[in-house]
Amino acid sequence: MLQNIRIVLVETSHTGNMGSVARAMKTMGLTNLWLVNPLVKPDSQAIALAAGASDVIGNAHIVDTLDEALAGCSLVVGTSARSRTLPWPMLDPRECGLKSVAEAANTPVALVFGRERVGLTNEELQKCHYHVAIAANPEYSSLNLAMAVQVIAYEVRMAWLATQENGEQVEHEETPYPLVDDLERFYGHLEQTLLATGFIRENHPGQVMNKLRRLFTRARPESQELNILRGILASIEQQNKGNKAE
């Protein structure tokens, strides 16, 4: 189950942080590390700071885009320390651990951490189902990347241990939720349809698509429900083409 939980680092700029993150992960039983467009490649410093977790570094998936790292996941949680102009469903670290373990029984889960200095962009955060914030000391809330990973990884492990200690058998059944890939295709289809009907203007969608993303993220439609929505969009497109042909 824990292998289904991906720790995703976006544009990490210091190899030492990669090593420290690998160490934080392995102490909690996590080994699935993804590096998105790292500004530097793992090197001897990363191996040194991994302190026995060099296998996590050696087996890390290095990809060019966040979409590649999220492919195949049904749940994505992004870390965010800043308040956003567009509110998003929030979790605390404990809730994040519980939800991640519950969903990782069936499909991959991604826990996404941003750049050392500026974190994740708004666009990247909008690809997440939830945001998680660590309730650090407001007078000094500066956690480095490995510290943040350690906090979240600890809560994941505690949630996983609870299922083991209670003797709970996790049912491995097909998740009813769509994968991130399916959701992104839906958002693309939705934007295309809204453009075709004139509801939004090309190059000037305003906040409409952002707010619609938030709406569907909050509602979190199941796979069958998403298929219904895609069918509605296809019907609107067909009707719109018919009107133009007349």
From Swiss-Prot:
Enzyme class: transferase
Catalytic activity field: cytidine(32) in tRNA + S-adenosyl-L-methionine = 2'-O-methylcytidine(32) in tRNA + S-adenosyl-L-homocysteine + H(+); uridine(32) in tRNA + S-adenosyl-L-methionine = 2'-O-methyluridine(32) in tRNA + S-adenosyl-L-homocysteine + H(+)
Protein keywords: Cytoplasm, Methyltransferase, S-adenosyl-L-methionine, Transferase, tRNA processing
Effect of H172A: No change in activity
Assigned EC number: 2.1.1.200
Effect the entry attributes to changing Y140F: Strong decrease in activity
Pfam families reported in the protein's UniProt record: SpoU_methylase
Family in the record: Belongs to the class IV-like SAM-binding methyltransferase superfamily. RNA methyltransferase TrmH family.
Function of the protein: Catalyzes the formation of 2'O-methylated cytidine (Cm32) or 2'O-methylated uridine (Um32) at position 32 in tRNA. Can also methylate adenosine or guanosine, even though these nucleosides are rare or absent at position 32 in the anticodon loop of tRNA.
The protein, known as: tRNA (cytidine/uridine-2'-O-)-methyltransferase TrmJ
Organism: Escherichia coli (strain K12)
Gene: trmJ
